[in-house]
Swiss-Prot record:
Lineage: Bacteria, Pseudomonadati, Pseudomonadota, Gammaproteobacteria, Enterobacterales
Name of this protein: Agmatinase
Cofactor(s) required for function per UniProt: Mn(2+)
The organism of origin for this protein: Escherichia coli O9:H4 (strain HS)
Matches recorded under Pfam families: Arginase (PF00491)
E.C. numbers: 3.5.3.11
């Protein structure tokens, strides 16, 4: 089985078109793309409500509502004129085999990065970030992590495949440096001695966006950054369609402003995870995820215009 393939390989969970109706390219390694979008339809590491495997399809589906705006407000330029972005479809793996998914995703990412591409990935549950971090660390070395979430995902339970343990495992493997990493929007219990800077939801909601961004920049410094956004960072009023919703989160407006504020960081990889459309209302969670993903691409495109 190939790592990537035609859409019929994952016909139960895949689309026939790309994010923002961007070109589909099932062999992106030799393409001239700057950024490659990969869907990872996986939710076997979920502890709460399952259904994240349908997240990539939902994000792509609702992104058609964003494709019409060329000079996007407030950027006032067309990202597609500055970045060559392709969608390579979904990772193909034997459903039910978490280890195969992890190994194939890491291999796919390593091949893309070796070819000079950058990755924007759609989960799937948050475990998919760990094989992506492994691939990125091989290419870029130890990185800083900027992590939006309701949970720190630093829990040590001894389980190999768990969407709540990646950021316990990643520092131990030398993939990320907790002392230069920040977790934003947290509002569940966590270990305060793991080295990460935690900006909990109360702090982030009560402080100005500029103040939060200034602290993030100070923590990260000039390190290569991996940006991961768990959609449950948003309050369930804005993102009900997720496996482990927690009230008291960020508004979609504040989240977008925070992502825009990361423009000056050296971001080398990005993902949006944990969209579970079965629990969504009027596709608002998928729309939030698609919009945040688009903003992530815009902060990359903005650098090319400077």
């Amino acid at each position: 089985m190939s790592t990537l393939g035609h859409q019929y390989d994952n016909s139960l969970v895949s689309n026939a078109f790309g994010f923002l109706r961007l070109p589909m390219n099932f062999q992106p390694y030799d393409s001239d793309a700057d950024w490659v979008i990969t869907g990872v339809p996986f939710d076997m590491a979920t502890s709460g409500r399952a259904g994240g495997r349908h997240g990539p399809a939902a994000i792509r589906q609702v992104s058609t509502n964003l494709a019409w705006e060329h000079n996007r407000f407030p950027w006032n330029f067309d990202m597609r004129e500055r970045l060559n972005v392709v969608d390579c479809g979904d990772l193909v793996y034997a459903f039910g085999d978490a280890r195969e998914m992890s190994e194939k995703l890491q291999a796919h990412a390593e091949k893309l990065l070796a070819a000079g591409k950058r990755m924007l990935s759609f989960g799937g549950d948050h475990f998919v970030t760990l094989p992506l971090l492994r691939a990125h660390a091989k290419h870029f070395g130890k990185m800083a992590l900027v992590h939006f979430d309701a949970h720190t995902d630093t829990y040590a339970n001894g389980c190999e495949f768990d969407h709540g343990t990646m950021f316990y495992t990643a520092p131990k493997e030398g993939l990320i440096d907790p002392n230069h990493s920040v977790q934003i929007g947290i509002r569940t219990e966590f270990d305060k001695d793991n080295g990460f800077t935690v900006l909990d939801a109360c702090q982030v909601n009560d402080r100005s966006v500029d103040d939060v961004i200034a602290q993030v920049k100070q923590i990260v410094g000039d390190m290569s950054v991996y940006l991961t956004f768990d959609i449950d960072c948003l309050d369930p009023a804005f993102a009900p369609g997720t496996g482990t919703p927690v009230i008291g989160g960020l508004t979609s407006d504040r989240a977008i402003k925070l992502v825009r504020g990361l423009k000056d960081l050296n971001i080398v990889g990005m993902d949006v995870v944990e969209v579970a459309p079965a629990y969504d209302q009027s596709e608002i969670t998928a729309l939030a995820a698609a919009t945040l993903a688009l903003e992530m691409l815009y902060i990359q495109a903005a650098k090319k215009g400077e």
